[in-house]
Design a protein with these regions (language model features):
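Conserved beta-strand signature within the Rossmann-like core of class I S-adenosyl-L-methionine
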Residues: 162-172
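SAM/dcSAM-binding transferase cores
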Residues: 178-233
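Short "lid" loop at the C-terminus of a central beta-strand within the Rossmann-like core
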Residues: 125, 147, 170-174, 198
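Short loop/edge segments at beta-strand edges and connector loops
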Residues: 41, 121-123, 193-195
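Conserved SAM/SAH cofactor-binding pocket of Class I
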Residues: 55-146, 152
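Class I SAM-dependent transferase core
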Residues: 1-70, 100-117, 225
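Helix-to-beta-strand junctions that scaffold the AdoMet/dcAdoMet cofactor pocket
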Residues: 87, 159-161
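Short alpha-helix immediately C-terminal to the canonical SAM-binding loop
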Residues: 101-103, 173, 177
């Protein structure tokens, strides 16, 4: 499959958006030669395992018009920059604790003339207690960030009541979901849908759409590192 074939396999992508996605992939791969943005080194492989993979989280049901997205632990901008390209009407916050990756993203979004992106350098536990970010997003995404009990504690405080956390997982998602029932209960959250899929390269993926039904208790998230050391299962 060519880069064009990969992005055009999604019917909701216009030609203009497809070209921006391809250009972003090119920028990531070029920068990856001098900075470790992603373990993937091949341009075509990145189109599948980064761009295509990021697009799979998109479902119009969970991404309202003029809404706000937070991509937690955005890394090289997947899926956050991809979603910002796809939905220019939505405001997208890209958050990560690694400043150098965010510096690259800032440069890249300026080159792509994306006006709907904000880059935030912070740990999730610190940002989630700030009023400007808490209970503020229609959808929060996280791609391959920690186990589900941990990332749920970090992500759900950012989600508005009635909004969604979209956890992008690989094989073993059902096991992680089974281990997350206690934290989801504490967070007043429940699973709305599970989307299973296979990438063109053959890897299995699962996306868990978790709905936030009530306000997050003030004790969450716990202090930095606590969710990793003592996950609530």
């Amino acid at each position: 499959m060519t880069a064009q074939d990969i992005v055009k396999s999604f019917a909701f992508i216009s030609l203009e958006r497809a070209e921006l996605l391809i250009k972003y992939n090119d920028l990531v791969m070029e920068k990856n030669k001098v900075m470790n943005l992603t373990g993937i080194k091949d341009l075509q492989e990145s189109m599948i395992k980064n761009i295509y993979d990021s697009l799979t989280v998109y479902d119009k049901k969970y991404f309202p018009e003029q809404g706000r997205i937070l991509d937690l632990g955005t890394g090289a901008g997947f899926p956050g920059v991809v979603l910002a390209i796809l939905r220019p009407d939505m405001q997208v916050v890209l958050m990560d604790a690694i400043r150098k990756k965010l510096s690259f993203i800032q440069e890249a979004v300026e080159l792509l003339c994306l006006r709907n992106v904000e880059v935030v350098h912070s740990r999730a536990e610190d940002a989630a207690i700030q009023p400007v970010y808490r209970d503020a997003f229609d959808v929060v995404t996280a791609r391959a960030v920690k186990s589900l009990p941990v990332i749920s504690e970090w992500a759900l405080p950012f989600v508005k009541k009635g909004g969604f956390f979209a956890a992008m997982k690989g094989p073993g998602a059902e096991t992680e979901l089974g281990e997350s029932q206690s934290i989801l209960h504490c967070m007043h959250a429940s699973v709305d849908a599970v989307k299973e899929l296979t990438l063109p390269s053959g890897e299995q993926r699962a996306i868990l759409y978790i709905k936030k039904n009530g306000v997050t208790p003030t004790r969450f998230p716990r202090k930095a590192g606590e969710a990793e050391r003592h996950p609530i299962k």
